[in-house]
């Protein structure tokens, strides 16, 4: 961890002694709490971690400092933050879903309570994953650090994409590591036109999960993760892996609540008003969580219990301006298995073994 986040983590691990010394016992205690504690204990540790001043108050400036460190750490080997967005702008996007309602007893701005932190971190799981993995080995698949490679034709520049690397990292917070290797652009309305038939043709040969992303006429960007292929159905289909997300002007993610199974919608060439032609997610017929008509010229987003999501756009009725669809390329089970069994058992558990060696029990026969 870098900067203020690294300094704060050091203070917490050394139990705030402020003597500049880190003992092995400090590390063992911290890791047992940070990685093996109860859910509430881990959340409390992370909440203390984002209190960068250690004053018991988590305000907006604390979160701004934390997010700056996160972005610098995650994207240090990338092309920095996307050219179309400055770092402060991206920080504001990720703070958009936070609520500072707690009175800190002074005339200063409101602060973030522990419960408000838990609510916010559920909406930005990539941030929570990063903060929860700072004491783990810095591997390629380190939780919270993975950014998928975005593959697209050269006739579309990075600046012309709705899906920026920071947004991909945000969405990836809800996915497994084997889904964060590569995402391939299948359809972009700027080059293919706003055409439902072209869209369906572009995604027809890809059976894996996809990301549908929309920028509407008001400038809002949002979408959904479709776990199942886009195929003709007369009713809702899909599974509980699907979710909705917002990317701009605020970043948030909404997973299924279990309230119903109205997850994914794809109706093509039906003549009944009760089966609206188009694609969407959640809610109910004609009152979807997100929906684009088959003409790709209009749609709507309503608050829905399927994902516990609010209206994703500024108003419930929206006009799509740009539509993208990305294929989430899965790493094969064989590849994952091969990577998982490299080396001997002792080599694979080298970190734990080193810790045991330090306390003299790794080679004990008892």
Regions found by a protein language model. Name each.
Residues 1, 6-7, 11, 29, ...:
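Phosphate-recognition beta-domain surfaces
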Residues 1-50, 60:
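EF-hand Ca2+-binding helix-loop-helix modules
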């Amino acid at each position: 961890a870098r900067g203020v986040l690294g300094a704060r983590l050091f203070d917490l691990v050394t139990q705030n002694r402020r003597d500049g010394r880190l003992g092995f016992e400090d590390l063992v205690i911290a890791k047992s709490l940070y990685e093996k504690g109860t859910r509430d204990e881990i959340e409390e540790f992370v909440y203390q971690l984002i209190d960068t001043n250690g004053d018991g108050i988590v305000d907006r400036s604390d979160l701004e400092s934390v997010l700056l460190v996160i972005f610098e750490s995650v994207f240090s080997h990338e092309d920095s933050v996307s050219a179309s967005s400055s770092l402060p702008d991206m920080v504001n996007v990720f703070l958009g879903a936070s609520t500072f309602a707690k009175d800190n007893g002074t005339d200063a701005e409101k602060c973030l309570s522990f419960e408000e932190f838990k609510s916010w971190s559920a909406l930005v799981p990539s941030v929570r994953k990063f903060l929860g993995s700072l004491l783990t080995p810095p591997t390629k698949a380190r939780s919270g650090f993975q950014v998928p490679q975005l593959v697209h034709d050269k006739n579309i520049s990075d600046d012309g994409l709705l899906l920026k690397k920071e947004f991909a990292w945000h969405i990836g917070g809800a996915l497994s590591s084997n889904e964060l290797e590569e995402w391939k652009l299948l359809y972009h309305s700027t080059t293919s036109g706003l055409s439902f038939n072209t869209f369906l043709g572009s995604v027809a040969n890809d059976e894996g999960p996809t990301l549908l992303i929309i920028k509407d006429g008001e400038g809002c960007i949002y979408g959904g993760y479709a776990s199942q292929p886009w195929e003709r159905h007369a009713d809702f289909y899909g599974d509980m892996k699907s979710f909705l997300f917002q990317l701009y002007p605020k970043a948030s993610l909404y997973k299924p609540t279990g309230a119903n199974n109205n997850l994914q919608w794809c109706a093509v060439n039906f003549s009944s008003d009760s089966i609206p032609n188009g694609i969407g997610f959640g809610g109910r017929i004609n009152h979807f969580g997100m929906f684009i008509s088959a003409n790709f010229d209009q749609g709507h987003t309503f608050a829905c219990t399927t994902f516990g999501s609010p209206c994703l756009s500024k108003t419930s009725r929206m006009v799509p301006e740009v539509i993208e669809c990305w294929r989430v390329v899965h790493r094969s089970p064989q590849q994952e298995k091969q990577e998982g069994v490299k080396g001997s058992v002792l080599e694979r558990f080298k970190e734990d073994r080193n810790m045991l060696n330090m306390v003299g029990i790794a080679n004990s026969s008892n």
